[in-house]
Design a protein with these regions (language model features):
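Repeat-blade elements of multi-bladed beta-propeller folds
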Residues: 52-56, 88-110, 134-162, 194-219, ...
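Extracytoplasmic/lumenal domain signature
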Residues: 73-84, 111-132, 149, 163-193, ...
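Extracytoplasmic electron-transfer domains, predominantly the class I c-type cytochrome c fold
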Residues: 197, 279, 501-520, 524-527, ...
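Mature N-terminal segment immediately following signal peptide/propeptide cleavage
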Residues: 46-87, 91-97, 642-644
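Bacterial N-terminal signal peptides that target proteins for export
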Residues: 21-31
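Short, Lys/Arg-enriched N-terminal segments with co-localized hydrophobic residues
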Residues: 9-22
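Bacterial N-terminal signal peptides
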Residues: 32-39
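N-terminal pre-domain segments of enzymes
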Residues: 45-69, 390-419, 426, 597-621
Length: 770
């Protein structure tokens, strides 16, 4: 590939915004007396508002509030104003506040409306357990839309393969929307599976609801086409093919007819809208399978790209690909951030994209031209059979990375390890390959940032007027080793006990006839498909624990969840009935299939993935690996928040994102290992968050200095909401995180465990003065 300075293509128009809305009449008898007047933020200038109408702060995804009552001078007085119990289960949804009503996910995944001043329940909208409608507890947020005259107000949520429209005042389904209030997320997708998931609610723009999707992680996943629907009717308005069709730009960056069988290239994270210009910016994810690409030779547009489209029509404007032919799962997913900066003596509107590889890419918002040069540099090549990686990758030349991009034996953190483990890990790391763009192979590779980032969901924001962008990120390595598809994959996935993660292929498994065979086959599917989220011991990791799921839901309930998806979990329709039965056997009696007992063979391969089209000859080989997350083996900080001044391209400060007290006493913060929460930026000069160790932090926006900490009832997930009711400013957190420390991992000497408190929504505010 020739050396180039930037990779954008230009096809730009300027737009003015004028909404066109149908008027609908709804009863508002439930609306409580004394509602405050509310101005919806409709643009990227952050205008004063009293609510939080978007789960990441606004169409610009800034996490920014213009409210100034809570300041650096008084934040130490912050206290609990009210609490509302969320109920059992794992919750990851961010709240909304419109006027003085807070909307949260609670009570077994119901949509619940609360009085935002008191936390008193106004109404709830439960989701039935049948038909894939399993509740919104694990969705990352909700969407709000209103007509010009505010007579029609809707909450839009996704769950179980559907988008639902709910009356924001009454909690009733909007019967005129699509099929009696619900829209099938497969609509418009040619190669749709049984069900298609979305972990985010999309974004509203004028009379449109724009949606991404989550297609799953396997070979031959469905495509991640971007779609926009009429918010009144649910009718499909436009679609953009992220895997191009013949005649579309980027088609030649794939093998011929790749759109017929390749998948992924989805938008599973947050995206951003420049309302004034009518431009929507998407962080587009990697192609699937994301860690091996013999079936997708080429650069694979628009995978791993920042993609700008006309929000009204879906017309292509420009793109920049951050990773060519991704085999590291380095897809961007944090929301692109909008800011206005002084550059070369002129004011420039920019868009900045944090990525999982640790780089921040900054562009002119209109033209797509990089603000500073981005160079193509040679990188190591893959030695896997059939693989053809890109000879170069793009590197920003001015803006420093926000995450660590290399790890050696010298970076080994031994605080959690026994002397035996220290020796074992040093030997293991000394033999492994490393490097930011070193492809995974048949021997172990240390990848940092690992496959979960770097930058991941919920973790970026901006003070646009100051040209400041804030990025939350993780320093979590992955240790990857590819094995042929069908062989067993086993990873420590956060544990430290030496497990020798080599593959253990077993011949002809079903012929063995052992009583434990279904559970062992189920473990194999679990390790390849479920373990990254639910942990190697079923105790939960990024997802909920599954050690009691069969007794709670019953075999039929588990089968339904696997096929339909539930909350943040996508559906897995490619696993046929026998494979699902094997998984249920393992979940029911995991003692029959202890670690290392997973088996493989032709039957397993048939269980997990479909085959390629019959006319694809020769069929490419397949390799797989686990995610290999090893968060506790690298020296801290394990996560950080980084503040950039984009007027200069320099880092202003970097501060650990919370702490991990299980690592023992420390005079400095070390960050959380797997934070699941986001921060908010207050116009008064604060950055505020609750970490996964039940601690609230308030940072000085200018310096990153910790100004105040206090205990919180539980660890946080999602992005808090900042709002004002009756002249009082509140910060509402979803404190529903549960235990944050990896199950089964011993504490360091002097370490203190953080018990999980009650799952609840907690609003903090300053005391009422008399």
């Amino acid at each position: 590939m020739p050396r180039r300075r930037y990779g954008a293509t230009y096809d730009i128009r300027h737009y003015s915004s004028e909404k066109e809305n149908k008027m609908h009449t709804l009863r508002s008898h439930i609306f409580v007396a004394g509602l405050l007047a509310f101005a919806v933020v409709n643009g990227n200038a952050q205008k004063p508002a009293t609510g939080w109408t978007d789960y990441v702060g606004g169409p610009d995804s800034s996490h920014f509030s213009p409210l100034k009552q809570i300041t650096p001078a008084n934040v130490s007085k912050l206290d609990v104003a009210w609490t509302f119990p969320a109920g059992d289960g794992f919750y990851s949804s961010s709240p909304l506040v419109i006027d003085n009503i807070a909307y949260v996910a609670a009570k077994h995944g119901a949509l619940v409306a609360l009085d935002a001043a008191t936390g008193k329940e106004l109404w709830s909208h439960p989701f039935a357990s049948s038909g894939g409608r399993a509740g919104i507890s694990q969705q990352r947020g909700m969407n709000y839309w209103e007509s010009k005259d505010r007579s029609d107000r809707r909450i839009l949520v996704t769950t179980g393969g559907y988008l639902y429209a709910i009356n924001a005042l009454t909690g009733k389904d909007v019967d005129s929307f699509s099929d009696h209030g619900k829209l099938d997320l497969k609509t418009g997708i040619d190669r749709a599976p049984i069900a298609l998931a979305s972990r985010t609610p999309g974004r509203t723009f004028e009379n449109l609801i724009i949606l991404g999707s989550f297609t799953g992680e396997g070979y031959l996943a469905p495509p991640g086409d971007i779609r926009a629907f009429d918010v009144h009717t649910g009718k499909l308005v436009w679609i953009f093919h992220t895997i191009p069709r013949p005649g579309e730009m980027g088609y030649d960056s794939w093998p011929k007819d790749a759109y017929k069988y390749m998948g992924g290239v989805d938008v599973w994270g947050e995206f951003t809208i420049d309302v004034k210009r009518g431009i929507v910016y998407f962080p587009v994810a990697s192609a699937k399978y994301e860690l091996y690409g013999a079936d997708r030779h080429g650069n694979n547009l628009y995978a791993d790209s920042l993609l700008a489209l006309d929000a009204r029509t879906g017309k292509y404007l420009w793109h920049f690909q951050t990773v060519h032919h991704d085999v590291w799962d380095y897809d961007p997913n944090q929301a692109p951030q909008l800011a206005t900066v002084r550059h070369n003596g002129k004011m420039v509107d920019v868009v900045a994209l944090p990525s999982k590889n640790g780089f921040l890419y900054v562009f002119d918002r209109v033209t797509g031209k990089p603000l500073w040069p981005i160079e193509e540099r040679p990188v190591p090549q893959s030695d896997l059979p059939g693989e053809k990686t890109s000879p170069t990758q793009p590197f920003p030349t001015v803006v420093p990375p926000f995450a660590r991009q290399n790890m050696t034996v010298n970076d080994l953190y031994t605080g959690f390890m026994t002397p035996e483990e220290v020796v074992w890990w040093k030997e293991r790391l000394s033999k492994a390959k490393s490097g930011l763009f070193t492809p995974p192979g048949l021997t172990e590779t240390i990848q940092i940032p690992g496959v979960t980032g770097g930058a991941s969901f919920f973790g970026s924001g901006a003070d646009a007027a100051k040209g400041m962008v804030f990025v939350e990120s993780k320093n979590v390595p992955s240790i990857l080793k590819m094995v042929p598809d069908g062989e067993s994959i086993s990873t420590n996935n956060g544990g430290l006990i030496p497990s020798r993660i080599d593959a253990h292929p077993q011949p002809n498994p079903r012929a063995a006839g052992a009583a434990s065979l279904p559970a062992r086959l189920g473990r194999t599917i679990y390790e390849q498909t479920c373990q990254v989220c639910h942990g190697p011991d079923l105790k939960g990791d990024r997802g909920p624990a599954l050690d009691t799921v069969v007794s709670r839901l019953g075999p039929d309930g588990v089968r339904k969840v696997i096929h339909n998806g539930r909350g943040a979990m996508p559906p897995f329709p490619s696993i046929p009935s026998q494979g699902v039965s094997d998984v249920i056997a393992f979940l029911k009696q995991p003692d029959l299939a202890p670690p290392g007992s997973a088996v493989a063979g032709n039957t397993l391969t048939e269980h997990i993935e479909p085959d390629y089209p019959a006319n694809l000859v020769p069929k490419p080989p397949r390799y797989k690996t686990g995610y290999g997350q090893e968060g506790y083996i690298i020296t801290p900080p394990w996560s950080t928040i980084t503040a950039y001044n984009l007027n200069t391209g320099k880092i202003m400060w970097q501060t650990p994102y919370g702490d991990t007290p299980q690592a023992g006493p420390s005079d400095t913060l070390r960050g959380n290992v797997f934070p699941r929460s986001g921060f908010v930026i207050l116009a008064s000069g604060l950055v505020v968050f609750v970490d996964n160790q039940s601690k609230l932090y308030a940072l000085d926006q200018k310096t990153g200095k910790v100004l105040f900490t206090r205990d919180a009832p539980n660890g946080a997930v999602g992005v808090p909401a900042v709002y004002e009711v009756g002249g009082r400013e509140y910060i509402l957190f979803a404190l529903t995180g549960g235990p944050a420390f990896s199950a089964g991992l011993r504490m360091a000497p002097g370490g203190v465990n953080t018990p999980a408190g009650p799952k609840s929504y907690v609003a903090f505010a300053l005391p009422v003065t008399k």
